[in-house]
């Protein structure tokens, strides 16, 4: 029906490549045997509690006998999740068998060989639009290369489904996303988690549609963009918060001098081997796990006898400023200066499991837990 209503139908294919995280610090872990057959593991670990479950499973120990302490990380970007669980389990097994501390540090070559990458995608888009730019229908097919193991492919492709048609109102949508096992390097979580591939394809398509219609790419996005009360392609009604897409696009393009540069640059580029241009793209993204499951986090705020404050959270600092944010929240709620607040290192023996540090969830979920704990 949607394609029947269209004045123009366009089909395009897009591909994205395998990408390495390239964090500055390679994977590293140290395991120390403890009393009663237990073990303590220190490492550059993105998700200490999932790591604890992996180590306990390999060693055949109860969770209470396994302590994971997160060290300061030299980058992660989603890449130090299950890879680090495997490394920590190997170090812990070595410590258990020898009764001595064991340390493992990957070389850069070992890191490149062993770690998972961003999923390469092949994508086919079909879009129907009216002459005024209004989208009437979209059909999307995506194929992700999972490599030899499933890893996070199920959830990465789920996220691609959500993002496939961008921040635009499209009433008639069909999206199919698949992940295929191959003999390539396996793929998993990387910053954006299935969104960058879809955003690249959809925003490239929007530019091509604008070109075919002889329409300004900004205007095409303004015609179709989300606003308050809009319904996404997956049925999510945007009615419980401010939807500022069009305002952001308007202000960004005004600040960039969009119209003036669009008029000037083609003239300036005449006869030049190297040409200059101006482009724009839109996206939308939620915080926390969303429809992937019920989300929760916990925190402990302990006020000492001298009025200083200790803050404990099960969410791990990955370089995003978590320690500062949580400390600021506690200081604000308790009415103390920031220098009176100390954020304690993530240690599975002293803090509650608050789920993984993924999906831009730490500030909104962990920060809310710190705020509530401080209030109480």
Where are these predicted regions, by residue range?
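Structural alpha/beta core scaffold segments of enzyme domains
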Residues: 1-376
